[in-house]
Amino acid sequence: MTSATQFDNVSVVKRANVYFDGKCVSHTVLFPEGTRKTLGVILPCALNFGTDAPELMEVQAGKCRVKLDGSSEWQTYGAGESFSVPGKSRFDIEVLETLDYVCSYL
């Protein structure tokens, strides 16, 4: 069962995903139906990420600004908000306050 605060009956990959010299660290969570998510933290910084699959980024805590590939507009997101990123694209993220996030691969 999944609630607003936790994921139940899942497997977690023990080894962390560490990117950008430790500025972004996440763990992969595997669900019984075959889907996966990552739970992570990004420290205050400016980064550029690439995606393979479409992603839904849910902000649990913190604050960031995001600019999707091909857009000139920055959007600001905080706790309780989310944004979608198309597959096979890139996005810029400027983390203003340490970001706690859940990333769903769609």
Curated annotation (Swiss-Prot):
InterPro entries: Ppnp (IPR009664), RmlC-like_jellyroll (IPR014710), RmlC_Cupin_sf (IPR011051). Keywords: Glycosyltransferase, Transferase. One of its GO terms (cellular component) is cytosol. It holds the Pfam family Ppnp. One of its GO terms (molecular function) is thymidine phosphorylase activity. Its EC number is 2.4.2.1, 2.4.2.2. It catalyses: a purine D-ribonucleoside + phosphate = a purine nucleobase + alpha-D-ribose 1-phosphate; adenosine + phosphate = alpha-D-ribose 1-phosphate + adenine; cytidine + phosphate = cytosine + alpha-D-ribose 1-phosphate; guanosine + phosphate = alpha-D-ribose 1-phosphate + guanine. It is an enzyme of class 2 (transferase). Belongs to the nucleoside phosphorylase PpnP family. PANTHER family: PYRIMIDINE/PURINE NUCLEOSIDE PHOSPHORYLASE, PYRIMIDINE_PURINE NUCLEOSIDE PHOSPHORYLASE. Catalyzes the phosphorolysis of diverse nucleosides, yielding D-ribose 1-phosphate and the respective free bases. Can use uridine, adenosine, guanosine, cytidine, thymidine, inosine and xanthosine as substrates. Also catalyzes the reverse reactions. This is Pyrimidine/purine nucleoside phosphorylase.
